[in-house]
Amino acid sequence: MQKEKIIQELEELKNDNRFRTIKTNDKSLYNFSSNDYLGLAHDKDLLQKFYQNYNFDNYKLSSFSSRLIDGSYLTVMRLEKKVEEIYGKPCLVFNSGFDANSSVIETFFDKKSLIITDRLNHASIYEGCINSRAKILRYKHLDVSALEKLLKKYSEDYDDILVVTETVYSMDGDCSDIKKICDLKDEYNFNLMVDEAHSYGVYGYGIAYNEKLVDKIDFLVIPLGKAGASVGAYVICDEVYKNYLINKSKKFIYSTALPPVNNLWNLFILENLVNFQDRIEKFQELVTFSLSMLKKLNLKTKSTTHIISIIIGDNLNTVNLSNNLKELGYLAYAIKEPTVPKDTARLRISLTADMKKEDIEKFFKTLKAEMKKIGVI
């Protein structure tokens, strides 16, 4: 490792407006960048109910060891059992969505395997693909026909094929048709992995659950750091796969388990999810209103969900736009390469259930005015 080379690389990132820094958010800003979609993490009444329900003297702030040593306490076992009751398949809790996604792929697939992945899948999925040393093929984003062409071409050449998709995509705010992908399993022999990071909670137990597709999905991954208002992830799969992960997944075996209090909160949210239906319906009204407002203002987006992507293109213009909005009281982060493809830098705007229509309307009108000022519309 050459320090001079690292310094040069960091300078290049700065010159290209791609240098990342860690900042403390100003809580006075109106937040259009939060992934707390249902507003659960900031619901004081909900938190109070949680605190009143349990004697926290019994719940430690660390598990002190991995699940295979002394970290598999009663709370996490109850949580996994509850997930199994709801989804009809065994569950294994991982420390994060990143660990869950990468672990599934790198544990079950190897250099003899073929992995076919949506081009815009999350970095955690690509991490697993690379670590597995499998052959990797990417299909055009959301294009099930392109996926089928690859399956038709390669299905005879590989005994071990994995197809990976997300439900809601976090940078474009669009959705995959997992029903169509599941239907391909009737004709082609492959394993299917689905990541529901940005749909769990927003759509109740998730899109796969709502469309009764859990049985057709070999690995259903549900990260909890978005609408789940927490940390960790569920991997929902057959018992034999769960046992294999317990015995072979390095990230599971060698990681200190999540603290009991975190999984107690995960269990509390899971058990109360059925009570959030009014909140979910109100949230979907906000989504419909926002997309309608964008159309009315002639602001273009490919988004169809609660994540609204406004593509600017140029890094500097996107950063300047984000900074200008911050000066006006809005937090809307600029997303740049390599998180998104080159020349597609954007504002990623996320809605939350505790927003008001009048505030959303005011924000989008302000956004349009600022876009005009810097000459991007």
Predicted regions mapped to residue ranges:
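Conserved PLP-anchoring active-site segment centered on the Schiff-base-forming lysine
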Residues: 104-123, 148
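N-terminal "arm"/small-domain region of PLP-dependent enzymes with the aminotransferase-like
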Residues: 2-61, 190
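Active-site phosphate-binding strand-loop segment of PLP-dependent enzymes
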Residues: 137, 141-194
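PLP-dependent enzyme catalytic core of the Aspartate aminotransferase-like
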Residues: 40-44, 48, 52, 81, ...
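Conserved N-terminal alpha-helix of the aminotransferase class I/II PLP-enzyme fold
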Residues: 54-97, 287
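Structural motif of enzymes handling amino- and sulfur-group chemistry
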Residues: 257-276, 282, 295
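Conserved PLP-binding catalytic core of the aspartate aminotransferase-like
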Residues: 40, 281-288, 295-329, 351-353
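Active-site PLP attachment segment
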Residues: 213-244
